[in-house]
């Protein structure tokens, strides 16, 4: 099979980590009879330098015409880069918002995996994490409080601010379907997180999620209030498989989940919509302070590529192979500087990529 991938290397360490992900994909393609065709597209600061825009219409059209999009990282040093003297809509990160909107991506998936080999980097006690954990946070991206009507006014000399939280049942239904589909490929458990004891929007969320669950009888659905979920993530993270939640709750919980894994350099991310076309990227930033020094950890980007194979291309075996290769390299004691510990072997970006390829 041939697959067309729009590659947005972006800024900082983006080109380095994307190079390693492409090498891994090419190895998988060679082993399993696939051909991955890459079209390089400018995004973020490099696009601003070349075109004056963080994402051009032409770049967006290329992305729309591809089977998937693989992104490195966007942005620079806020205190030093001229990009941040520009209006907000012309800054690097605006390109990311633009492509999510342009591709109608409404679901963000962030896996939170603690590999057994990296337990020492986890801030939680060993008796809590055991042999590690593996769950995903699925966050709705385009509705809720962040996109509702807002205002700030002064009434009788008193300042007053209002934000509006709105969801309709179609918005809830489409992301709930994604959560159940992903659970079918994992542990077949969905935990829907809300604040249904207080919020009408959460009560609707809970109702619609239960309706969708009827189409997935193999998947176990549970409901959890968001404050309890925040506690359970640090008390017993192993209980979770797929956490489904709305925009603001997901924003907070996914960051909490990322911290208990020990290193953000290990965390992949996917943004999905109604079609198989998705945006795959590491959760970390562009790290301009180490750009070009062969120090960046490419694993999050490589794992993002594995997610692309699984969710956009339905190549489950190939995705599993990449993830197993990452685990094998970690088990042998190889580490980039961000996850380095005593007794391990320090390697650079390129070397880590080569080691993972050798295990495929």
Specify the residue positions occupied by each region the protein language model found.
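Extreme N-terminal starter segment of soluble prokaryotic enzymes
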Residues: 1-5
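Glycine-rich phosphate/diphosphate-binding loop of Rossmann-like nucleotide-binding domains
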Residues: 6-23, 28-29, 155-227, 239
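Buried hydrophobic positions in well-ordered alpha/beta secondary-structure cores of metabolic enzymes
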Residues: 11-14, 67, 138, 179, ...
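Generic secondary-structure signature for well-ordered alpha-helical cores
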Residues: 26, 30-34, 65-68, 101-108, ...
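N-terminal beta-loop-helix "entrance" segment that forms/cooperates
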Residues: 33-57, 231-233
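Glycine-rich phosphate/nucleotide-binding loop
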Residues: 45-48, 90, 234-334
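N-terminal glycine-rich phosphate/adenylate-binding segment common to multiple enzyme folds
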Residues: 49-162, 248
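Glycine-rich phosphate/pyrophosphate-binding loop and the adjoining helix
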Residues: 142-143, 147-186, 190-191, 196-198, ...
């Amino acid at each position: 099979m041939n697959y067309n991938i729009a590659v947005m290397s972006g800024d900082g360490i983006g080109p380095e980590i994307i190079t390693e992900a492409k090498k891994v994909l090419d190895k998988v393609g060679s082993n399993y009879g696939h051909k991955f065709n890459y079209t390089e597209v400018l995004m973020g600061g490099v696009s601003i330098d070349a075109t004056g825009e963080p994402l051009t219409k032409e770049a967006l059209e290329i992305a729309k015409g591809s089977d998937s999009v693989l992104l490195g990282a966007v942005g620079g040093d806020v205190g030093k880069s001229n990009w941040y003297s520009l209006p907000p809509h012309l800054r690097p990160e605006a390109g990311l918002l633009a492509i999510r909107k342009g591709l109608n991506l409404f679901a963000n998936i962030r896996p939170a995996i603690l590999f057994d080999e990296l337990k020492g980097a986890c801030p939680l006690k060993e008796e809590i994490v055991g042999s590690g954990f593996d769950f995903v946070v699925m966050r709705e991206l385009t509705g809720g409080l962040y996109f509702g009507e807002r205002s700030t006014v002064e009434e009788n000399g008193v300042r007053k601010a209002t934000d509006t939280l709105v969801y309709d049942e179609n918005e809830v239904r489409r992301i709930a379907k994604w959560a159940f589909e992903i659970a079918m490929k994992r542990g077949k458990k969905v935990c829907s997180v809300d604040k249904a004891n207080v919020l009408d929007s959460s009560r609707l969320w809970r109702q619609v999620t239960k309706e969708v669950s009827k189409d997935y009888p193999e998947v176990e659905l549970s409901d959890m209030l968001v404050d309890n979920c925040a506690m359970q993530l640090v008390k017993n993270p192993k209980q979770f498989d797929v956490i489904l939640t709305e925009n603001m709750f997901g924003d907070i919980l996914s960051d909490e989940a990322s911290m208990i894994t020990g290193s953000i350099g290990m965390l992949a991310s996917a943004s999905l919509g109604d079609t198989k076309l998705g945006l795959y990227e590491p959760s970390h930033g562009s790290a301009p302070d180490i750009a070009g020094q062969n120090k960046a950890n490419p694993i999050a980007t490589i794992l993002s590529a594995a997610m692309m194979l699984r969710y956009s291309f339905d190549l489950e075996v190939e995705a599993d192979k990449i993830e197993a290769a990452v685990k094998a390299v970690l088990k042998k004691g190889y580490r980039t500087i961000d996850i380095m510990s005593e007794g391990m072997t320090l390697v650079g970006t390129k070397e880590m990529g080569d080691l993972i390829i050798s295990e495929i």
